[in-house]
Structure formats: structure tokens, C-alpha cells
Amino acid sequence: MGLFGKTQEKPPKELVNEWSLKIRKEMRVVDRQIRDIQREEEKVKRSVKDAAKKGQKDVCVVLAKEMIRSRKAVSKLYASKAHMNSVLMGMKNQLAVLRVAGSLQKSTEVMKAMQSLVKIPEIQATMRELSKEMMKAGIIEEMLEDTFESMDDQEEMEEAAEMEIDRILFEITAGALGKAPSKVTDALPEPEPLGAMAASEDEEEEEEALEAMQSRLATLRS
């Protein structure tokens, strides 16, 4: 506390160093999320291969869509890392300016990067907090609340799924699936005949496993 109970402002250099530390911490969080999603994707690939061997086209399609969602999430996380690197570079520049001018300067590069970062759900809270601190320090201007994802995101995902599903299945099954989705069952091995009760139990177990896998992927992406 300063005189008369007022909070003393931190020196600009200390602020910049604190922001840099927070950003590096968030980058490590993003790295972990990317690794978790990619590990789960490997499990999905194995499930696609198993489903293809059993002739379960519908299961393959559902899993392929999950992979598309996961890859899209990973792509966004990599983009967020690039933006965080831009902010870190901006912080280095601020320290250089501080040594010469004695004060922090407004930065359009940092502003643009932070505008993108506050839209990433995984790091949104921290980035909003940093944005407020940077606005107070005069590095960036007040940002408008235009941080909502496109309302057409789900629709775009479905369209992308239709476009990418052949490629994903072809890639995972080494050509057994993917060229013609409406005809893939013709090229798939016939499932081994099972008793009615055994087949029903297997289907229930597979459905439960599929739902569990979808739930894990959704949790990692949220």
C-alpha cells in the first residue's frame, strides 16, 4: 500500500515480466491440451480400423467426424500459440522501448494478438485479465466484445465433415474406406456370424465405448 491507503503501481518492467510469465504458463497449458487430444485421436484411429474390419460404416463415419473436430481444435490451439509468441515478442519490444523512452508504448501488434487470444476458450480467462492490465498500462486500447465464435461454426463443421470424411477414412484404413462412402460396405470384410444374443451384447458394448470416447474428446476440446 502507498500513502493514504492507495495501492502503489508496479514498475512497467515488472508488469511486462509478469505478463510474459503468465503467457508462457498458458503456452504450457495449451501444449498439454494438444498432446492430450492427439493421444485420444490415436485411440480413435484404432477404433476406426476395428469398426472397418467389422463392416460398421456408421461407426466409422461418427468417429471420422470426431477426428475432424479434434484436428480443428488442435489447429486453433496451434494458432493460439502463434499469437502468444507474437505477444511475447511484443513484450520484448516494450522492454527495449522502456529502456530508451522510459515508458511503455501502445502496440498494434500486441493488440491484434490479444484480440485473437481472448476468443480461445481454453485460455480466455487469463487473456481477458491480461488485456485489462495492458489497457490500464496503455499498451492496447479497449477491445470490443466481439469475441463470440461464428454462429455458423457447427454448420461449417458438418460441411467440413462431409468434405473430409472420405480422406480421413481412406488415410486410416489404407484405402479400405473413403473413396465412395455410399458404397464402402461393398468393399468391407463381412462381419463374422455371431449368435443373436452375443451380437446384441457386443453392439451395446461398442456403443458404450463409442459414447465414452466421444465424451473424452469433447471434454478435451472444451
Swiss-Prot record:
Residues 151-222 are annotated as: Interaction with VPS4A. GO terms for biological process: autophagosome maturation; endosome transport via multivesicular body sorting pathway; late endosome to lysosome transport; late endosome to vacuole transport; midbody abscission; mitotic metaphase chromosome alignment; multivesicular body-lysosome fusion; nuclear membrane reassembly. Transmembrane segments: none annotated. A motif (MIT-interacting motif) lies at residues 201-211. Residues 196-222, 203-207, 221-222 are annotated as: Interaction with STAMBP. Residues 59-64, 168-169 are annotated as: Important for autoinhibitory function. Residues 22-54, 149-222 form a coiled coil. There is a cross-link at K179 (Glycyl lysine isopeptide (Lys-Gly) (interchain with G-Cter in ubiquitin)). This is Charged multivesicular body protein 3. The gene is CHMP3.
